[in-house]
Amino acid sequence: EIPQHEKNETKKLKDKFHDKNIYIIAKKEGEVVGMMALSDERPFSLDLKLNDIDKYYKGSYKKPIEIRLLSIKQKYRKTKVFTELIQRTFNYIIQNAYDIAFISGTTRQEKLYKHIGFNRFHENVGTKDAEYIPMYLDLNSDNKVLDRLARAKRINFLPGPVDLAEDVKEKLTKQLYSHRSNEFVSLTKNTLSKIERILDVETATILHGSATLANEAIMAQLKGRGLNNGLVLSNGEFGNRLVKETKRHNLNVDNYHVGFGESFDLELLDKKLSEGNYDFVYLVHNETSVGILNDLDAITKIVKSKGIVLAVDAVSSVGAVKYSYRDVDYVACSSGKAFCSVAGLAIVGSNCELVPLENTPLYLDLHYANKMISIPFTQPSILMEALNTALDAFKTDERYENIYSKYSYMKEGLKALNLPIMKIKEKEVSPVIITVELPENISSLNVGASLAINNIFIHYKSSYLVERNIIQFSFININTTKEEIDYTLNILKKMIGDN
């Protein structure tokens, strides 16, 4: 319709930038009814029109993107397709942290571009019949349209960061107060008591850091107790990480490794522990990378029958799966996963004596932290306030029941779409997360990015997922509803069909 190209009999044209374009498309059933093309590789189309944008645009930027080729089939132009297409395009731009957008705007839509926030920076270019306005949008400047898009409701299937309840959010706005005050000491004691009840452990200790710190502090205890020889179990990414961490602590570890998402052979484990000279066993309870809830009851029974110390990374199971850790020696978790508070507080539950560590960095000394009532150093009061409030949700089993209910509902919906869910032994299927193994002809990166521009956020970018073409849906987020699950399944169906 804009006569910038010569006519041809096929009425088809391959864009000269096609191989580097990112396309945002609008579909109705199986029909593509609208599209937008983006490119973040220079030279842009506008570079060629101006013989280099930077000769005329004098502002600064670090990560530019060009928007081109807006096209909507005629019968859909008076529908919401344009608005929705613009929204998805800017969702992509915002989510990927671009700081400026360039366009060659058609003169007939200058008013619309200005409404969105674009500004002219050069005189018109092109021909009399196909005239364009070089324009830019500074994505770091105040913009009501972009602000509204940034505040749009999001559907969260990520395993973190998690949704926060309103009362937890309120605690984050409180005035900070001293970690040495009586108020903070009382708050911390109360928080520790709640954690000990939920985990069913003798002692809880809180450190200022991520869940990795909790595991590191446990490893420091093992080393300090002279428990140098260990067996680390791994059947996923986080078990593999434990192997690397224990070695960094100069612990002598063997790795009982099985395939990604496979179950441990309990008879073989028993044999390994009987024949080996092991002081401790370390494993992940809920292996998030695959969605397997390792049979901790059976493993604990075997390990303790040998008189061996047992340490558990329960970062993604605590708060999501009701479980008593009474029979393990150490358990690591954090504030930022299924407890549904803000990340930043590492938690260690223990059912054994914590030993002082004279030759270990003080930050890793659980004995010292515990002796100081989990206030060995500065602790941010708002993080403790938020966690303390979040823990009140575990006075009943409702949180666990909701997670399982949403998991079951989504699982049935994915089955209806014939999407292959990773096969896990029935007894060890985790209700925390569903792992979908996409067919080779469907890109996990494209599916994840397409859901993201629709404000649906899933777990798909981690390298261990990308290399296996896997996507994941987590159910620890408190605000996700069954209606949102239905919406997500509907979007998936429109994107990839019934497979």
Model-found features: residue ranges?
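Conserved acyl-donor/pantetheine-binding loop and adjacent beta-alpha core of acyl/acetyltransferases
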Residues: 17-19, 31-77, 131-132
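A glycine-/small-polar-enriched, mobile loop at the entrance of the PLP active site in fold-type I
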Residues: 153-208, 212
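Active-site C-terminal subdomain of aminotransferase-like
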Residues: 163-164, 336-412
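Conserved acetyl-CoA-binding loop-helix of GNAT-fold acetyltransferases
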Residues: 77-91
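Conserved beta-loop-alpha segment that forms the PLP phosphate-binding cup at the N-terminus of a helix
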Residues: 201-231, 235, 239-243
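Conserved GNAT acetyl-CoA-binding A-motif
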Residues: 93-105
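Active-site phosphate-binding strand-loop segment of PLP-dependent enzymes
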Residues: 264-315, 319
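Conserved C-terminal alpha-helix-loop-beta "cap" of PLP-dependent enzymes
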Residues: 415, 420-483, 487
